[in-house]
């Protein structure tokens, strides 16, 4: 396997493509899977937030994380036949991890209260605790729900406990397993969705590993201030300032590109350092202020140089398939 140049990747992604969520990269989530529903032969459809994308079956989803209304949520399929035993084991593991957190000053214990929740799924437990030793006033909640076909974890924090309780209860009571009959209010997770319209604060991050050492990343965030600068503008500015001396950049394709009625900018470039070349594909859309239908979106792909036509076809097909999830 050819080793990618760390310098080249750092320069192109961080400086030109504007980077991706470090927190999302560090998360280790249970592996989700795609579905062939709605996809062409040999393709899989992946749902994320309020959008969907089709990718060749050779692509594997490595990480998918999402937030809705300030709550971090992800669902998963049970591994064991004895669901009750599995959920108790997972819950105890979570509690053990929470108990190892550093205690804020002035607090006597990490966990404030553990409780069963009624009216949410088939079974639900919640733990209230101090999750940040630097800010002792923040109250964290982690909730674990058994919905039958799937389990779900939710974590959020805040200063107003009643507001947090109302928020996560509303989110969890609107969860549905599967992707049939999606609506404009569907916010998709790994295996199901939350049927709530956009209100505020939504984030999605996904990373895929594909053939020919391709890495595809997708990031979506609601924005409160639309930026006029796109990926092409950042590339031009970086080259003008010689921001990465020693890196030769060959522009293969650049310009405006509309994806799923979302206006944006696209670049396909080749970067070379010390005779090692990599290909970088990127598209972004600035979104609209405070919108779930038009979030700020960044899609990027990096891989070793070579097979440009084949990789470009994969890239174009992926962007052409990107669409609102309700239209799948």
Where is each model-derived feature located?
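Positively charged n-region of N-terminal signal peptides that target proteins for export
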Residues: 1-4
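Bacterial N-terminal signal peptides
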Residues: 9-16
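Bacterial Sec-dependent signal peptides at the C-terminal "C-region" and cleavage site
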Residues: 17-29
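A short acidic-to-branched-hydrophobic micro-motif
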Residues: 61-106, 153-157, 202-238, 266, ...
């Amino acid at each position: 396997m050819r080793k990618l140049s760390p310098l080249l990747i750092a320069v192109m992604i961080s400086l030109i493509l504007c980077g991706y969520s470090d927190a999302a990269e560090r998360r280790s989530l249970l592996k989700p899977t795609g579905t062939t529903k709605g996809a062409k032969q040999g393709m899989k459809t992946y749902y994320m937030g309020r959008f969907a994308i089709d990718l060749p079956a050779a692509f594997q989803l490595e990480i998918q994380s999402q937030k809705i209304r300030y709550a971090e949520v992800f669902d998963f399929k049970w591994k064991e036949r004895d669901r009750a035993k599995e959920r108790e084991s997972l819950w105890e593991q979570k509690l053990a991890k929470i108990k190892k957190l550093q205690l804020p000053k002035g607090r006597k214990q990490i966990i404030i209260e553990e409780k069963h929740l009624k009216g949410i799924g088939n079974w639900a437990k919640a733990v209230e605790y101090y999750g940040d030793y630097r800010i002792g006033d923040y109250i964290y909640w982690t909730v674990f729900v058994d919905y039958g076909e799937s389990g779900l974890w939710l974590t959020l924090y805040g200063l107003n406990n009643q507001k947090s309780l109302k928020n996560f209860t509303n989110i969890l009571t609107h969860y549905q397993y599967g992707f049939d009959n999606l609506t404009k209010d569907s916010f998709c997770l790994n295996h199901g969705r939350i049927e709530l319209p956009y209100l505020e604060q939504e984030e999605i991050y996904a990373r895929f590993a594909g053939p020919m050492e391709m890495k595809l990343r997708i990031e979506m965030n609601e924005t409160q201030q639309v930026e006029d600068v796109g990926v092409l503008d950042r590339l031009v500015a970086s080259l003008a300032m010689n921001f990465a001396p020693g890196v030769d950049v060959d522009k293969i394709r650049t310009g405006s590109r509309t994806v799923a009625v979302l206006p944006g900018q696209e670049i396909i470039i080749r970067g070379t350092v010390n005779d090692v070349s990599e290909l970088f594909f990127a598209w972004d859309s600035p979104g609209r202020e405070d919108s779930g239908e038009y979030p700020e979106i960044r899609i990027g792909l990096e891989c070793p140089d070579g097979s440009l036509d084949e990789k470009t076809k994969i890239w174009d097909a992926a962007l052409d398939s990107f669409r609102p999830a309700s239209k799948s």
